[in-house]
């Protein structure tokens, strides 16, 4: 079977890392990129040099209006570059892109993302939560994808991708009565380097490098969309902290069935080595956040940091590279839905 052909709209943090993940996984073929704000020579530079994940280990250059990306032992990607502001104008079909990753953060509804289908794309994967597109978390509910009807889908958020596999394992084994999630989250591009105006959410406009900033997140409630049994049982919030990448979820939950910490560790380790291998990982090491930069998992359970008050009340800790782990799942989701075509 030929590899799925992919277009990327928006060559920002996620767009570029989806391309890196695609090159490393070698499971999809990226054939087009669109970004109205980045010239092709600037794309080469931004892809090659990354302050967080380091220099790209392969080669990247441009020939005419094509990016040529290659890495030793991996397939070469010859990528047509577009600079359209209107997604309906991007010639995905002409470039041969069947699957479009919508990573601008702008076209996150079915109506807006539908513009990509007009340009010849067959499916759109939104790399953000969506108000109305069905959300899929690889390892949790990706098998509910319906090829006949799901043309525009969401890969949910990086935090939902971390929390959902953990919540699934705990709920399947012990049952979750209710839970609260906190994510201690690295800075992202929407934040300000110094204090500035920020619409209705005044705190979000404060300097990212000098503050711990309480923020809202829909990630916990979104778990109820991907695991219907948990609908209405989880909510959460975020603290934005001055680190460039890697975040950590703290899930505090009441369990239906009593469990020891060893019981919990055992079922998570079994899932990480079995059905959720590659998505969920398990560590007993004395780790800190930078140990997970460029980690490809959605969620890495920290056995040593997790605690219990009593057999029905637990606090579980799980790390995630909110950029690269998530980008790898975007590629995995495309690989999966392509098998249903």
UniProtKB/Swiss-Prot annotation:
Keywords: Cytoplasm, Glycolysis, NAD, Oxidoreductase. The keyword Lipoprotein does not apply. The keyword Cytoplasm applies. It is found in: Cytoplasm. GO terms for biological process: glucose metabolic process; glycolytic process. The active site is at residue 158. Pathway: Carbohydrate degradation; glycolysis; pyruvate from D-glyceraldehyde 3-phosphate: step 1/5. This is Glyceraldehyde-3-phosphate dehydrogenase 2. It comes from Caenorhabditis briggsae. The lineage of its organism: Eukaryota, Metazoa, Ecdysozoa, Nematoda, Chromadorea.
